[in-house]
Amino acid sequence: MVLPASMRLRGHRCFSRLHRSQRRHHGKWMVLRQIKRDRTLLRSELRSQHDTTCRCALVISNKVSKRAVRRNRLRRLLHNHLRQRLEQRTDLAGTWLLFSLRPDAAEAEPAQLLEECDSLLKIAGLER
């Protein structure tokens, strides 16, 4: 399943700010970047909405896999996992997260990716 619209992070300004973020947590297959929200970076129609949970984005480049089918499968797997973990967490409202998969992530087993995702959330202080 895809992340609900209330949890999605969109817009090049948001991604640029997250890429410059100092709060990075590195794993073997992915990198987690984290910042507090900055409403000025959002599109005008989203600025007035109140965040009920954190906003997330997932970046999977062509370096991970040349095949779109494989990249989409990884995206769906991680979106579903993040949705289950973070959708009900109202204490994380105002936090923006960016998960970037590394090129060798395509060789990892799905269980390993989900475990690393959880460990990065725990390191970042976002997991209970």
From Swiss-Prot:
A cellular-component GO term for this protein: ribonuclease P complex
EC number: 3.1.26.5
Annotated GO biological process: tRNA 5'-leader removal
GO MF term set: 3'-tRNA processing endoribonuclease activity; ribonuclease P activity; tRNA binding
UniProt keyword terms in alphabetical order: Endonuclease, Hydrolase, Nuclease, RNA-binding, tRNA processing
Stored InterPro entries: Ribosomal_Su5_D2-typ_SF, Ribsml_uS5_D2-typ_fold_subgr, RNase_P
Record function comment: RNaseP catalyzes the removal of the 5'-leader sequence from pre-tRNA to produce the mature 5'-terminus. It can also cleave other RNA substrates such as 4.5S RNA. The protein component plays an auxiliary but essential role in vivo by binding to the 5'-leader sequence and broadening the substrate specificity of the ribozyme.
Protein name (database record): Ribonuclease P protein component
Organism: Synechococcus sp. (strain CC9902)
Phylogenetic lineage: Bacteria, Bacillati, Cyanobacteriota, Cyanophyceae, Synechococcales
